[in-house]
């Protein structure tokens, strides 16, 4: 049996934030959720999350699962105290207890599984992940003999000689609960910080093993925003490398960010300063960017998106969008359509080969195939209290600077005169003009007063 305890009670003072440290995000997921996800792959019987600072916010952030339980540590007196609090909940547990911090977002399930296997193979009381760091500043030092841990000294308690040791404590433990439960409540706060350290269990347990792994970045804990940024860069490098090896070209990968959930097809070209977020799906032979932002969008084959933003919409094949277009949620742009300069579309369906080339707003609308929307067209869909639908049939031509006052229905092959304000429905094959008659006054003299 395996129980997991994730320590997430701390404030994270060095983050200089109103947000609990474990709720800061990497590539769209909180630090804590990333740790939970890795632990879930081990299929533990239970995961206990030890919370404290802003505990309600932390609990609400976690994706609910029947094997996840929360325990409040109040006050927070250190890592050892957290497990003392936990011990009141798991008195009859049999098997292993894995303990890790909620701020190691890059930890892999494979590494955790290897730790458990190592621990079981040694019949250890405790096994601890360790690594050698070129710069061990901020980490507790681990002192071993024949792979058995003699002691761990927190950096704040290290003397000069102890600080020179490069073997560090990653803060990830696998305990035999049967043995740990006998000594956990004997821990004292005999240190400079007046905290109860979990590391003090090492001297009280007989078979304490070091499980040394290569420091490849996955053990990085997050204590400040510099480290947060470094981890973000690590994640993004891995994501983009995977896509490049899978057939995607990045013109300037360092300037782009891609969510882990996004799927990108073959021969897609991602230009500089492009960001693809959420559950986006981009099919083969598309060109995205430069300077584009796409979130939760489906983009079919052979599309071109330039300097534009697309949210939660579906773009069919051979569509060209941009530059400077904004596709807001709940839009569907059908095949071979063209959305051009400074166009905003919201909650609308455009049938195939529709052209909206310039300076237009299309909201809460349905536009039939082969229709051309002239420059400056506005669908006036909001009366200050309620939004209304605009329907435009196929093969229509909407003149420049037309305002369509919704609710309104234009049939097939309707033409509107440039500058018109259309307030009434128009039937098929009609011309709709609604504008003031031009008056020319000769010999006009401007009043200079």
Swiss-Prot record:
Major location (coarse): cytoplasm
Organism phylogeny: Bacteria, Bacillati, Cyanobacteriota, Cyanophyceae, Synechococcales
Keyword tRNA processing: no
UniProt-recorded name of the protein: Bifunctional protein GlmU
Broad enzyme group: transferase
CC cofactor: Mg(2+)
Organism per entry: Prochlorococcus marinus subsp. pastoris (strain CCMP1986 / NIES-2087 / MED4)
Disulfide bridge map: none
E.C. no: 2.7.7.23, 2.3.1.157
